[in-house]
Amino acid sequence: MSLKYSNTTADYLQWGEAMNLVRSLYKDEDYKMSLLIAIGCFWGLRISDMLALHWKQILNVDEFTIIEKKTGKQRTIRINQQLKRHIADCYKQIQPIGINAPILVSQKGTVYRVQSIDVLLKKMQIKYKLSVKNFSCHSLRKTF
């Protein structure tokens, strides 16, 4: 819930700033969030579709197909080499329980909720001094 008369429209992240954020998060050993930002910016998926992804779908493949939750449409996504390397590096660092595991799992072992991701993004905005206003999950989709 937002404050009355407040602007809640998500803003996009500048591409260079987004890529710097991906690198900074990786360097700071926040591999899951680095992967989330990279996937969100490169593929333009809705957060509900990103949270539903599993490692077996995206690891060591050139493309994959999903059914979008909101629209029910089938979408084929190609993975460029730069992102493919980043996914493999994050997989090695995160060390998930298996290839069938979801890619975005919290410390509790459950898939993140959208609200939790939004809170983490707002903390990231402050920590990394991002120039984007109203930074949220949808900002990643708009950056695409």
What is each residue range found by the language model?
Residues N7, K69-D89, N100-K122:
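C-terminal catalytic core of Y-nucleophile DNA break-rejoin enzymes
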Residues S2, Y12-W43:
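Basic, Lys/Arg- and aromatic-enriched nucleic-acid-binding interface segment
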Residues L36, S48-L53:
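Alpha-helix N-cap/helix-start motif at helix boundaries, enriched for small hydrophobics
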Residues L25-M33, V119-T143:
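Short, basic (Lys/Arg/His-rich) helix/loop patches that form interaction surfaces
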Residues Y91-I94, N134:
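Charged, surface-exposed interaction regions in soluble eukaryotic proteins
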Residues E17, A52-R85:
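Conserved tyrosine-mediated DNA breakage-rejoining catalytic core shared by Y-recombinases
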